Amino acid sequence: VLVILQQGQLINKTGVDVQGIVEIVSPQKTQNEWTFVGAPFASDYTLGAVKPVSEDVAMVKYNYTQGAWSNDWATINTHMEAAEGTFAWPFYTGAITFSTHNFGASTSSIYPANATADYTLNNGDVTVTKSTLQNTEGGYWMALANPYPAKLSVSKFLGENTSRLQGGCVYVFRNGTFDIDANHLSSGSDSIAMTEGFFVNFQENAEKKAVFTKSQLKNWNGNNTQAKSSSEFIELTLQNGKDKVRVYFAHNEDAEQGYDIFDANKMFATTGVAEPYFVTDGIALIKEEVAELPYYATMNVRSQQDTVMNFVLTNLPEGYAVSIIDGEEVIDLVEGGVYSTEILTGE
């Protein structure tokens, strides 16, 4: 069983579906309170995919015929559509988990010995079309959910759907209340988490259609792998003769543009070859894979001897730039290029 935890992501860069049983743990944690969720499955599914099932989680669907929420609780056999959002009320503390295994009429959350994958993680485009009825509060609402097991970019989703939407925004339901997520985000976030539901309000004369594509994913890059390994990181190799050390940088989606490169964290070396470590509040933290840095980050090199150091840059994603500030000179590194500089003893 593959488990994708609350802050995890699974971005499938291939056209081949993930096989086997996968659990997706929702980031929304509530107890005795409404939350808004949906499973990232490729096709219709039943609430038998919710773990724990039945008496532990109550769910209701949106009734498009009536333009209102259903008065009936969903049952273990109620069908949900791909990218459909539903209100859920957990009767326990913890997260709702969706499984590609259908537990069916059983209320057990334990996999049987012959458990099979009844549902497939969504790995393609999804188009949701409804004949929405104007509800009592006005507007033509659609209840949606992120159809991918990874973060969905609000701005990218709006880029393909804004012309049909009222207000050019989406509405999320977080911490028991509604909030607006738009290009100018009142919530300070541009992400719809995996399994998170949201609402859109269509213009009266617009086609009631919502389009999802994998290119709308927050961390989507069609040219590079997204697996959580060193290949995801920009790799900078420092060489000194036969000795070398690799330093990895990863993009942090929460960083702010315009970060002052001279204010970034610094990494020092205590040997002839640079060894990266942060100095934060006077504490040295050794860390090769650096995942929590701003868009711009500096690496200072410190050596115990005079030497010549070569900088080699690989795995640079499209649209990214890496520069070295050598004294007063700023050098833009190119993919696969080598920059040599003399490093004196000290920093």
Place the predicted regions along the sequence by residue.
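Extracellular beta-helix/beta-solenoid repeat scaffolds
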Residues: V1-T30
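Conserved "landmark" site that anchors the functional core of diverse proteins
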Residues: V25-Q31, A39-D44, G48-Y64
